[in-house]
Amino acid sequence: LLIPYPPLEEQKVSAHILSTLDEKFEVNNQINKVLENMAQAIFKQWFVDFEFPNEDGEPYKSSGGEMVESELGMIPKGWEVKGLDEIAEFLNGLAMQKYRPTENEKSYPVLKIKELRQGRTDENSDLCSSNIEKKYIVRDGDIIFSWSGSLLVDIWCGGKCGLNQHLFKVTSDKHDQWFVYQWNKYHLDRFVNIAKSKATTMGHIKRKDLSDSKVLIPSDELYLKAAQYQKYLFEKIMYSKIEIKRLEEIRDSLLPKLMSGEIRVPLNEEGDAS
């Protein structure tokens, strides 16, 4: 059986195109890690260590900033202590097997833990009816919290999909996404330990654990100053994730077409790509 192959030079050009795409989203992944680490470091400096710049540009706590007693210990004067569930809504997803699309009905891919981990849906993702309640539809930029099994908090940038059970969509009409996201990330290690302690069942957390997880609300003035940094970083991460998804889609679409010869790379007389 003879299998036709494109000319060697054409194969090399195709391989170069695909490897360039791979390199591009690997670079984006590395940039995202740096941005995430930067955002978390700034958040910890301001909201955990209380070393945000005072009026003179000096670290607040170590420069003698006024502190008051609270249930969390000493905190900056004027700050409030609240439960994690007081700053955001945690919407649990649906048992999507009950919402399968009917024949010829528009559908959405279902967001499960697998999809959250890989950052996108794929051809193996389950489908759900597009007629589910709007609040269960996930869009780019939504904060998703896997609270059972593999605990994970991430910014979803994999396109529109349906929210499956065991996942929270975390939203707030009181605070910016960066603020809600960073506090959820801050408490994630604690949630993982709580889940691990449930040895007889699949590890998970309860809503009471959200209430017991405390957050600090600064003054409006300081909140706005922090937002100048955090909002910018949050949006950079989100847009970079969206670009990674698009690059992966281009690669996955090109690969079988280049391999099959459906798409040919034009070469000039010297055998180079034209």
Which residues fall in each region the model found?
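Short coil/turn segments at secondary-structure boundaries
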Residues: G57, S62, Q97-E105, I194-S197
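Non-catalytic DNA-recognition/assembly elements of restriction-modification systems
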Residues: L2-I42, S62-A95, D220-P266
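A short beta-sheet element
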Residues: K112-I113, N131-D189, A195-T200, K206-L210
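C-terminal, helix-dominated tail/subdomain
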Residues: V265, D272-S274
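Extended non-membrane alpha-helical scaffolds
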Residues: P4, N29, E51, E80-G83, ...
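Sequence-specific dsDNA recognition surfaces
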Residues: E66-E69, D85-R100, S107-D140, G162-L163
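A short glycine-rich beta-alpha junction/loop motif
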Residues: L1-A15, C161-F168, K198-L224
